[in-house]
Amino acid sequence: MPAKPEAAVITHPLVVKAAAEYALEKGGIVKISDSPAIGLFAKILKDGGYRKAFEGLDVDFKEFKTSVKIDIGKPFGFIDIAKDALEADAVINIAKLKTHAQMFLTLGVKNLFGCIVGLRKPEWHLRSGIDREMFARLLVRIHRAVSPHVTIVDGILGMEGQGPGKGGAPRRLGVLAGGSSAFAVDVAICRMLGADPDRLPTNKAARELELTDYNVDVIGDYEGINNFVFPIQDPLTFGPRPLHRILRKHLVQRPAADKNLCKLCGECWKYCPAEAISHDKEKVSFDYDKCIRCYCCIEVCPEGALKAVETFPGKIIRRLLLTH
């Protein structure tokens, strides 16, 4: 989404520039691509400082628009992945270190969801529904299909709190991590932040598929980050199956709008995969029975007007669990 680098929503252009300069020095033809869920690609490049940062460099900014159907295996079957990403001689995957209310963190593996073209992303959110683990397995399969040669995660200025959109808080972490394995990079960053690697669903999915064993060799400075603020997360399903919907509705944190910030731009209801958002001339409204808690609306809100909030019963139960 369109954002300035200091918001810590997008990868900083100078990190991407450094990778591009290296590739150019090695004789590469460099294309910088993405498929934004929201906003014009040109506006993202302008607002994010990419156009200015890359002045004078022989690179091509090219939005992913054409897909190729790839069979990524059961239960997903065929998925449309950006043709340019699949046909490139080498893919350098450059992600932002930021929190994610649904998937815990956005790191190297999840970043490749950007290779799903445009509005096909909500379709896969909806197909995965409330199953966080299934969505993680989807992301791991996409990673395997794209098979990046190098993954870099920009955490020089990262995001903590209720990310991944403007509801999160920028924090200077001074972290720049990279490696030939996105799984290894993600595991190392989790440990650096003080989190068990299994808390990141894509790590767990990759381990179950025997794509990583969490044994990571780290070269360079590796100091832990103190007091990193992770997103509040609730299990999306719990209790007896017949009660899943009602328990999720009343206990799991939900997206909510700040009327003072909301400009009724329409991005949230246009992008909502579950079609759970409606609006009138004064406000947006949420159907929490339909809402799958993917928090896409929060991520795409250009005003930072949407946040994940705890329900009152959810707060009570969380406090009881913390005191026992």
Language model features by range: what are they?
Residues M1-K259, K263, W269-K283, Y288, ...:
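N-terminal and secondary-structure boundary signal
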Residues I292-R293:
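Extended, alpha-helix-rich binding/interface surfaces that flank or overlap catalytic cores
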